A protein has these predicted regions:
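The AdoMet/dcAdoMet-binding core of the Class I SAM-like
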Residues: 2-16, 63-197, 206-216, 220, ...
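SAM/dcSAM-binding transferase cores
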Residues: 2-44, 217, 238-292
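Short, surface-exposed loop/turn motifs at beta-strand boundaries within globular domains
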Residues: 36-38, 48, 133
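N-terminal glycine-rich anion-binding loops that anchor highly charged ligand groups
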Residues: 43-51
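Conserved S-adenosyl-L-methionine
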Residues: 223-234
Length: 292
């Protein structure tokens, strides 16, 4: 008698840029919804047993419907709470639509610009992961530009209160690699209004500590204040993930944040004022490992 049960299928994530060796994350896949290539990368969408639908680009998990809100609140809402009533935001990347969804919740924002290099990512996300954008791409307040984000930044000076770098990872020789350089951070600073904020993902604190440290050090040579905030986004290697804010003005105090939270439409799922108060706290062993 033969066992005809279907063998479970797992997606195993590729090695992380500048990440530690010896570990990979595998996710049980119910169904492969898309496996295609665009001009800029290999795009896959899986329906998974734990995370639900999951977007993968070049073998690296980008987002899932299960926990995208943690990442996008930490990228967009956190930065918006550093300035009282920001008026304008530029999102570079963010083709899944989660960042613009969060930006639309910031009541004071009058200008929301998104520069995404790969229209295919937007089309795929709209078709297979509409829960993440939740209609944000169709909102008339959003100015969508299909262009290399670095080129867009160079042409705009002192225009934005917030710049969110929601690109793919800094894979060598990829379009995103330049977006993690000190040269580009200077260009971003030029695109910001005085006292503006840039927000970016710094990689896994657990598995990419060298990348996190390098990015913080680069930003410190450009901005007066650079703050690293850890949060657990389960899809990102089940580890502490680093979010970075950089600005020439310090982070807001908790009392200010509690007041400025009124500028956010609806209720945050992750970023409460209580969570904010402890965000910058890193365990001693991590501080030592990062050398920051």
């Amino acid at each position: 008698m033969t066992n005809s049960a279907k063998k479970p299928s797992y997606f195993t994530e590729a090695g992380l840029p500048y990440g530690r060796e010896g570990i990979r994350i595998s996710v049980l896949v119910n169904e492969t919804l898309l496996d295609a290539k665009s001009e800029y990368g290999h795009i896959q969408v899986f329906d998974t047993a734990f995370f639900g639908k999951m977007l993968v680009i070049d073998g690296i998990i980008q987002t899932t419907v299960y926990d995208e809100f943690v990442y996008h609140e930490m990228m967009v809402i956190l930065a918006s709470l550093r300035i009282e009533k920001p008026q304008s935001i530029l999102i570079i990347g963010g083709g899944d639509g989660g960042a613009i969804k969060q930006a639309l919740r910031v009541k004071s924002l009058k200008r929301i610009v998104m520069a995404e290099i790969d229209m295919t990512v937007i089309d795929v996300s709209r078709e297979f992961l509409p829960e993440i954008s939740d209609g944000a791409f169709d909102d008339p307040r959003v100015e969508l530009i299909v262009q290399n984000g670095a080129e867009y930044v160079r042409r705009h000076k002192a225009e934005f209160d917030l710049v969110v770098l929601d690109s793919t990872d800094p894979v060598p020789r990829s379009p995103a690699e330049y977006l993690f350089t000190e040269e580009f951070y200077h260009e971003v600073k030029d695109a910001l209004e005085p006292g503006g904020v840039v927000a970016l993902h710094g990689g896994s604190i657990t598995f990419q500590p060298a990348e996190v440290t390098t990015l913080v050090q680069r930003l410190r040579r450009v901005f007066k204040y650079v703050d690293l905030y850890p949060a657990i986004v389960p899809a990102y290697q089940l580890s502490l993930f680093g979010f970075i804010n950089a600005s020439d003005q310090p982070q807001a105090k908790t009392a200010e944040v509690e007041r400025w939270m009124q500028n956010i439409e609806g209720q945050n799922k992750y970023l409460s004022s209580e969570v904010y108060e402890t965000l910058g706290v890193l365990p001693p062993y991590i501080q030592k490992e990062l050398g920051l």
